Design a protein with these regions (language model features):
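Signature of uroporphyrinogen-III synthase
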Residues: 1-198
């Protein structure tokens, strides 16, 4: 018997992931444990920056019209979805890092760039900047929400839980009793996310 896939990421990523899973005829349980909300931000002067760093598609979805001030800069995006949304937003030059921010920073370092503006969420994990100055501009918050009753029944099915961030992994670990963890398989987007799951 194939285990159901438990998708806990916030919308719209939850529905997008579910659609891809269903295309492979996988049984899904879509239960977001977070909601992404924009936060007010003051656009910094783009002049000192040689590029923007985008580690999450949520930054592009929530930044709003002020993002237009930075479209002339090259965008460095983690993941294909983030890169696609950067192009859709109007960035003409988009460099994609397919795996994680650490590898992308290594790639950026070879270009000799010295200062980037990082559009990000309130909760961001530290990473090696490879000597590059990174100024963070918080444009969203990923806020935990109470799981519905269907969450407990989904856990009882012994699902394969997908975690798309260390924050999501930590939240899942917080909600699942230690004795129940042996019945849940985990698929993590990165080593950091797997480690955060405990």
């Amino acid at each position: 018997m194939i285990r159901p896939l438990l998708i806990i990421r916030p919308e719209p990523g939850n529905a997008e992931t579910a659609a891809r899973a269903r295309a492979f005829e996988l049984d899904t349980r879509c239960i977001p444990l977070f909601e992404v909300r924009p936060v007010p931000w003051s656009p910094p002067d783009p002049a000192p920056y040689v590029g923007v760093l985008l580690t999450s598609a949520s930054a592009l979805r929530t930044a709003g019209p002020e993002l237009a001030r930075y479209l002339h800069l090259p965008a460095f995006a983690v993941g294909g979805t983030t890169a696609r949304l950067a192009r859709d937003a109007g960035f003409h030059s988009v460099v994609v890092g397919e795996s994680d921010v650490t590898r992308l920073m290594g790639k950026i370092a070879t270009l000799g760039l010295h200062r980037l503006l990082h559009f990000c969420g309130k909760d961001v994990r530290s990473f090696d900047p490879y000597g590059i100055v990174i100024d963070r501009c918080i444009v969203y918050a990923s806020e935990a929400i109470e799981p519905p009753e269907t969450f407990r029944s989904a856990l009882a099915e012994g699902p394969v839980a997908m975690v798309h961030s260390p924050l999501a992994a930590a939240r899942l670990a917080e909600l699942v009793e230690p004795e129940s963890r042996a019945h849940i398989a985990l698929v993590a987007i990165s080593a950091n996310a797997a480690e955060a799951a405990g």
